[in-house]
């Protein structure tokens, strides 16, 4: 195995977020309010199963322990179960997770688990069906809730739920969310609304700091948990009276980037060192054949030397991220 991926600031990278499509069937207000529109940036289409196998094999050789499949909506790919199985072939990958809108969860989650999926994140921005419809553009609240139940029935011990925190939309609904997770092993993760190139107006209207929720959780006796090396960026809190947990993802907080442990590859095979970086490094020409793995690993390692110490969101610089469906949020 090659040496562990480490950048110029001594950060080690154990976690790959791999987008497999930028297509999504939801129209979330903070991501794709006008729905998915093909970009026309490639004539080769999205990464194939073989290309996904090769890129994850290279990252595993460089010390990656966790792969999260993202989109767009990953489950819209007809070969999604085959993709999970391809990643699972590598024993060095200890965790394979997916971030999904839950649209196909009830129908397919048992098959995903059988293929090797170990973790699920479901996007749920409101527990009110009408508000859920207003945010997502889809009247699928009950279907998504049934999907979460199906995940537990399929054998997942915990489900993570992602909730984008928005002022005057859901920031005042903490008690409703807490009641929901009191007897369910759900890690509910509130994610601060992030500014993107297409979402500046929405950001100015609805952004609120997660500090507000953190202060309230601590006041109520919630306890901050230690972070593991392949965990995502959430600050996780638990409470003895709750089966569930609360996570807070606050990218505008000081030192947020100090614990960065993840890299991103887009659905067309570009490596991104940061969600809000300025550009990507093409890997696809080195995904055509198994004999290219050494060159692929070298390109990844060299690219990492250019990773910046921090993002520049505080300067309203969102890089190339026009919306979060492009490189998987």
From Swiss-Prot:
GO terms for biological process: Mo-molybdopterin cofactor biosynthetic process. [4Fe-4S] cluster 2 binds at residues 257, 260, 274. It comes from the Bacteria. One of its GO terms (molecular function) is S-adenosyl-L-methionine binding. Its EC number is 4.1.99.22. S-adenosyl-L-methionine binds at residues 30, 72, 123, 194. [4Fe-4S] cluster 1 binds at residues 24, 28, 31. Residues 8-234 form the Radical SAM core domain. The keyword Metal-binding applies. Keywords: 4Fe-4S, GTP-binding, Iron, Iron-sulfur, Lyase, Metal-binding, Molybdenum cofactor biosynthesis, Nucleotide-binding, S-adenosyl-L-methionine. Its cofactor is [4Fe-4S] cluster. Binds 2 [4Fe-4S] clusters. Binds 1 [4Fe-4S] cluster coordinated with 3 cysteines and an exchangeable S-adenosyl-L-methionine and 1 [4Fe-4S] cluster coordinated with 3 cysteines and the GTP-derived substrate. It catalyses: GTP + AH2 + S-adenosyl-L-methionine = (8S)-3',8-cyclo-7,8-dihydroguanosine 5'-triphosphate + 5'-deoxyadenosine + L-methionine + A + H(+). GTP binds at residues 17, 68, 99, 160, 262-264. Pathway: Cofactor biosynthesis; molybdopterin biosynthesis. PANTHER family: GTP 3',8-CYCLASE (PTHR22960:SF28), MOLYBDOPTERIN COFACTOR SYNTHESIS PROTEIN A (PTHR22960). Belongs to the radical SAM superfamily. MoaA family. Catalyzes the cyclization of GTP to (8S)-3',8-cyclo-7,8-dihydroguanosine 5'-triphosphate. NCBIfam families: moaA. Monomer and homodimer. This is GTP 3',8-cyclase. It comes from Shigella boydii serotype 18 (strain CDC 3083-94 / BS512). The gene is moaA.
């Amino acid at each position: 195995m090659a040496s562990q991926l480490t950048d110029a600031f001594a950060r080690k990278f154990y976690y790959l977020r791999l987008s497999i499509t930028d297509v999504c069937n939801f129209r979330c207000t903070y991501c794709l309010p006008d729905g998915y529109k093909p970009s026309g940036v490639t004539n080769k289409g999205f990464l194939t199963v073989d290309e996904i196998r090769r890129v994850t094999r290279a990252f595993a050789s460089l010390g990656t322990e966790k792969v999260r499949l993202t989109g767009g909506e990953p489950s819209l790919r007809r070969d999604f179960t085959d993709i999970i199985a391809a990643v699972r072939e590598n024993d060095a990958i200890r965790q394979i997770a997916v971030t999904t809108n839950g649209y196909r969860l009830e129908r397919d989650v048992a098959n995903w688990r059988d293929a090797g999926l170990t973790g699920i994140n479901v996007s749920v921005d409101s527990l009110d069906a009408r508000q859920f419809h207003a945010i997502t553009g889809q009247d699928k609240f009950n279907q998504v809730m049934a999907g979460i139940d199906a995940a537990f029935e399929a054998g997942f011990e915990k489900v993570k739920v992602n909730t984008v925190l928005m002022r005057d939309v859901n920031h005042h609904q903490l008690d409703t969310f807490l009641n929901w997770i009191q007897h369910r092993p759900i890690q509910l993760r509130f994610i601060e609304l992030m500014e993107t190139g297409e979402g500046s107006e929405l950001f100015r209207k609805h952004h609120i700091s997660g500090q507000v929720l953190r202060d309230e959780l601590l006041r109520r006796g919630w306890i901050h948990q230690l972070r593991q090396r392949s965990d995502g960026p959430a600050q996780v809190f638990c409470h003895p009276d709750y089966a569930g947990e609360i996570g807070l993802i606050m990218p505008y907080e000081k030192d947020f980037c100090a614990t960065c442990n993840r890299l991103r590859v887009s659905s067309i095979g570009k490596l991104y060192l940061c969600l809000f970086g300025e550009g990507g490094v093409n890997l696809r020409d080195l995904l055509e054949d198994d004999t290219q793995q050494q060159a692929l690993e070298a390109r990844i390692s060299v690219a990492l030397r250019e990773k910046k110490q921090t993002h520049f969101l505080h300067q309203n610089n969102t890089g190339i991220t026009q919306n979060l469906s492009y490189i998987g949020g």
